[in-house]
UniProtKB/Swiss-Prot annotation:
It comes from Homo sapiens. Keywords: Amino-acid transport, Cell membrane, Endoplasmic reticulum, Glycoprotein, Membrane, Phosphoprotein, Transmembrane, Transmembrane helix, Transport. Uniport that mediates the transport of neutral amino acids such as L-leucine, L-isoleucine, L-valine, and L-phenylalanine. The transport activity is sodium ions-independent, electroneutral and mediated by a facilitated diffusion. This is Large neutral amino acids transporter small subunit 3. It is a multi-pass membrane protein.
Length: 559
């Protein structure tokens, strides 16, 4: 029932559009936890932990049917902690599984888990006193299903050639913007729609993801455009010829003759044959398959190691702000002073709530900012050639052709140039974000919100595009998963930083923000290394005239 790779290629725009919608409404929806928390408390989850005589210290409205207390908040936040951990920690094993089995089975399992998550939450709400513990399993399945959908969608841009980075940025942007989903559901809930109805409807919509994947996603993984056998897999494997020539053999002849024609025609005075014999074709075809790059060399490459530091630092900066934004806003409103009267406390709560709502709504900007960084990564790629061939370089030198008169733009060099621009811009915005955090001006926080949202969309998109450009496509899932896992470990440091801010620093965020600002300067090390690596690669091209196959097998290892 699964389509072939050629059929999936013809449906690639449908798959891309539906993947964006699926990411937006079904991927990292746990990032909108604040709205879901209010719904769960209104439904009475873990209200049994509150004393019967409790007059909760949280705000209650007239529609509230259940008591609330700090114990209830702790239990529900524990569920969120488990779900968010699953969302981040499972990226590495998912990447390994996806590299081995392809995206189709992973996506099917992810959509099934998300469906089960919504169903469990709906069933648990029918008897919250007995079934409240199901929320832990439901949130775990929600996080796991969401990351499965996100990871598999990142392989789709391989079907779009020069638009790959832009499409990948759009996928990551829809993932980052999914934090708006639960606030939208809360609006529906506040309009009077029952929580059970909402969850069962959401579960039914998740079943459509399973159906869409079954009908349109192929069993094979999507090859990257720069792979040697990309054209064979996408365009030629289904080609039937009257002369009984198979797709593989036809591809071999086309590739061999293409390489021959791309070189300078040899002179008869050299004593070499000007034409290729059948033996030459067979001999060349034996060397045609791309040499496999070991995973350990990609893992130990300086590019990947520097990206781990940059992404971990940025993740810590972003997650800490998301965790402490309410406390920071409260400090800006109160100036660090406690207000005893209820009127003053209510005013502070309303102001913080308003700014928090604006910050949540701005997460949709990720859907617009992520394609922008993808456009930067795709800049002038379509005007590039793969690499200089040795025959071309030697022929030009022999005939006295000035290489400076015709300087082709090489794809590998251009991708590195675009990555340098993308990471430099992202780090500059991150530094600007850190500076605005240091300024005690409440209205300036709107600028801080915008910078935070842009950086959150930029750095994931830039990293994914860098990995796709530099490393072999069969390593993409493993490298991305390991990077996400390391970044999640870095993000755990936000808890002691938060405790230090609300404890010894008495709510003042200045010193923590200053330390994080200085730490964020390390992000410029990655584009600095990429600049050095690009210069070295340019020297190799100029000195050796490396061909495309040698570049693919050699330069990626030393990246």
């Amino acid at each position: 029932m699964a389509p072939t790779l050629q059929q999936a290629y013809r449906r690639r725009w449908w798959m891309a559009c539906t993947a964006v919608l699926e990411n937006l409404f079904f991927s990292a929806v746990l990032l909108g936890w604040g709205s879901l928390l209010i719904i769960l408390k209104n439904e009475g989850f873990y209200s049994s932990t509150c004393p019967a005589e409790s007059s909760t210290n949280t705000t209650q409205d007239e529609q509230r049917r259940w008591p609330g207390c700090d114990q209830q908040d702790e239990m529900l936040n524990l569920g969120f902690t488990i779900g968010s951990f699953v969302l981040s920690a499972t990226t590495l094993p998912l990447g390994i599984l996806m590299d081995r089995f392809g995206p189709r089975p992973v996506r099917l399992v992810g959509s099934a888990c998300f469906t089960a998550s919504c169903t469990l939450m709906a069933l648990a709400s029918r008897d919250v006193e007995a079934l409240s513990p199901l929320i832990f399993l439901a949130l775990s399945l929600n996080g796991f299903g969401g990351i499965c959908l996100t990871f598999t969608s990142l392989t789709l841009p391989n079907m779009f050639g020069n638009l790959r980075s832009t499409l990948m940025a759009l996928m990551i942007g829809s993932y980052a913007s999914s934090a708006i989903t639960f606030p939208g559901i809360k609006l529906i809930y506040d309009a009077g729609v029952a929580f059970v109805v909402i969850m069962f409807t959401w579960s039914g919509l998740a079943c459509l993801i399973f159906l869409n994947c079954t009908l349109n996603w192929p069993i094979e993984a999507f090859p990257a455009p720069e792979e040697v056998n990309y054209t064979k897999k996408i365009k030629l494997s289904g080609l039937a010829l009257d002369h009984k020539v198979t797709g593989d053999l036809f591809y071999t002849h086309v590739t061999t003759m293409g390489q021959r024609l791309s070189q300078k025609a040899p002179s008869l005075e050299d004593g070499s044959d000007a034409f290729m014999s059948p033996q030459d074709v067979r001999g060349t075809s034996e060397n045609l398959p791309e040499r496999s790059v070991p995973l350990r060399k990609s893992l130990c490459s300086p590019t990947f190691l520097w990206s781990l530091l940059t992404m971990g630092m940025t993740q810590l900066r972003i997650i800490f702000y998301m965790a402490a934004v309410n406390k920071m806003l409260e400090y800006l409103v109160t100036g660090g002073q406690e207000h005893e009267t209820n009127e003053q406390q209510q005013k502070v709560a309303e102001t913080v709530g308003f700014y928090s709502s604006v910050f949540g709504a701005m997460q949709l900007l990720c859907l617009l900012t992520c394609p922008l960084i993808g456009y930067i990564m795709d800049w002038r790629i379509k005007d590039c050639v793969d690499a200089p061939t040795q025959g071309t370089v030697l022929g030009d030198a022999r005939d006295g052709v000035a290489t400076k008169s015709i300087r082709p733009r090489y794809c590998k060099i251009q991708k590195l140039t675009n990555a340098i621009s993308a990471f430099t811009l992202t780090n500059l915005l991150l530094v600007g974000f850190g500076i605005t955090c240091l300024i005690n001006n409440l209205h300036l926080q709107f600028v801080t919100f915008v910078l935070h949202t842009i950086v959150r969309g930029f750095f994931h998109s830039a990293c994914g595009s860098l990995y796709a450009a530099v490393f072999p496509s069969n390593h993409f899932g493993t490298l991305t998963g390991l990077q996400s896992l390391i970044s999640a470990v870095f993000a755990l440091l936000q808890q002691p930083l938060f405790m230090a801010m609300v404890g010894p620093l008495k709510g003042e965020p200045f010193w923590v923000n200053l330390g994080l600002l200085l730490f964020s300067l390390l992000g410029f090390l990655l584009p600095s290394y990429l600049f050095y690596y690009r210069a070295r690669l340019q020297q190799e091209y100029a000195a050796n005239g490396m061909g495309p196959l040698k570049v693919l097998s050699g330069s990626e290892v030393t990246a």
